[in-house]
């Protein structure tokens, strides 16, 4: 049994990869699923569609790999984080659509928590800013709006979970209601110092403890799949939120190492070791992973709109036919000619945390063309990352020596060069871009003893290309100053 199955449940698609012990992909499958926007600021997924696409991908990947489920050493799961589900324990049926991490419907509830003076208490316990991004206020909203939900929750009839919990519940035939420490740390309900659910915060939001999953290590066997799902009972031995899994897959095992994932959003995580670093610059202190009871912490900066900006150029503006076309279009001009795009379509994440910022486009002239807007879009992705690195540096977690990158948009050579230029440090792209799924596989493999430890895993990591900064310092500083001026104008655009 030398194969691993990685289930990668993302924001826009479900993926599954079968990997061998060398981290080589033997079979893969991917399916997209529908995004639902029932009201402005709302983003939902169909929980049943999440399951259907993920499990179908798992079976297809095994078939393409020519690997029977009985030959799997373990299953690892990685998932879109913070997305919130509520279901019946008796049937496993979801009571409402999944509220996606991008959803802003609880922004006003977060305002009330801040106005009541709870922000410092929440930050001290969870390491998080009070924001609609996280699960806590989403869950409270479901309990308030699904008829009878709070009473049923108190009676122990309902279960809450992020996507990992939802998948494990159904993989195990309802036998397991668990989440890993990293996913738990994204709920705004988990004390990251004591590594347990915070009773004070549960009481504050009137969330019955009976709803909550058991918190387990990110690496280690927590149970098995039921044979009906995959065709055999397979140990479930790895669970990690997508960004934690990507950090693990990038072998960022030493304090000070960092990776940025360019997906729907962009997520920069820096390993801070066995001790949490409290940010004074509105970054998130989070749990990277927990193995054998030992916790590794990280600083995180979350960008809400990353690759989604390229999708908007394609679907919203019609400037490109395919997402890959943005590189050639942006490369057709030497710079953006002063055009600045602030992609605050759903507000701004770290380090601003402004739910009322909105997307803005500055510096347009009669000479502005599609190529300038495309280039400004790539620059916006890179400049948001610059803001995060600067905040980490101020928090004492830097200076950054190099940035490891992954995610779909990391394949864009122009974006990676722009990123290196604006950061002023090398950007390193690995040979294996599927680092999120790889991280899930690594966590699972470690959990069943496939590797001796993280040192052996680190030796597997290989760079594909290194992008060195070539931009002059004065041009870099001018671009960053122009960007920050634009961000200030975009902030607070809509009324609270």
UniProtKB/Swiss-Prot annotation:
Any GO MF annotation of the entry: glycerol kinase activity
Pfam family of the protein (one): FGGY_N
A Gene Ontology term for the protein's cellular component: cytosol
Activity regulation field: Inhibited by fructose 1,6-bisphosphate (FBP).
The keyword Nucleotide-binding belongs to this UniProt entry's keyword annotation: yes
Signal peptide: none
Positions bound to glycerol: 81-82, 133, 242-243
Residue numbers binding sn-glycerol 3-phosphate: 11, 81-82, 133, 242
Top-rank taxon, per record: Bacteria
GO biological process terms held by the UniProt record: glycerol catabolic process; glycerol metabolic process; glycerol-3-phosphate metabolic process
Positions that bind ADP: 11, 15, 264, 307, 408, 412
Pathway where it operates: Polyol metabolism; glycerol degradation via glycerol kinase pathway; sn-glycerol 3-phosphate from glycerol: step 1/1
Top EC class, one word: transferase
InterPro entries associated with the record: ATPase_NBD (IPR043129), Carb_kinase_FGGY (IPR000577), Carb_kinase_FGGY_CS (IPR018483), FGGY_C (IPR018485), FGGY_N (IPR018484), Glycerol_kin (IPR005999)
Alphabetic keyword roster: ATP-binding, Glycerol metabolism, Kinase, Nucleotide-binding, Transferase
Ligand binding (ATP): 11-13, 264, 307, 311, 408
Listed EC numbers: 2.7.1.30
Catalytic reaction(s) noted: glycerol + ATP = sn-glycerol 3-phosphate + ADP + H(+)
Function text: Key enzyme in the regulation of glycerol uptake and metabolism. Catalyzes the phosphorylation of glycerol to yield sn-glycerol 3-phosphate.
Family: Belongs to the FGGY kinase family.
Protein name from the UniProt record: Glycerol kinase
